[in-house]
């Protein structure tokens, strides 16, 4: 596991139950504003999805991941529903359920 992947996983652990964040928000939090795709790639290597809740990460429009690594979009939706996050046609309302690392210090290597 790379240092970057470890940092992504630690960031994802910060997302509270009942909230989601975006790949881009994680990348910005880690100091890589153009690193959304790298965040997604790291999440595909999540060794412990129960501990590292990657189902709480959606795209910038609130859309679920069609290639959600732990069973596809339907599984991600069921995990989000279990967290109390409604999903409408594969989209989470980011205005209501978005969480963006406000008031947290950026992590460093």
Task: Enumerate the predicted regions with their spans.
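Nucleic acid-binding interface residues in structured DNA/RNA-binding domains
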Residues: 1-109
């Amino acid at each position: 596991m790379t240092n970057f992947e470890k940092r992504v996983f630690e960031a994802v652990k910060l997302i509270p139950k009942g909230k989601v964040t975006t790949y881009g928000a994680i990348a910005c939090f880690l100091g890589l504003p153009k690193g959304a795709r790298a965040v997604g790639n790291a999440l595909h290597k999540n060794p412990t999805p129960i501990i590292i809740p990657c189902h709480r990460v959606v795209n910038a429009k609130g859309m679920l991941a069609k290639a959600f690594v732990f069973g596809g979009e339907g599984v991600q939706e069921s995990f989000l529903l279990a967290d109390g996050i409604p999903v409408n046609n594969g989209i989470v309302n980011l205005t209501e359920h978005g969480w963006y690392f406000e008031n947290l210090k950026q992590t460093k290597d």
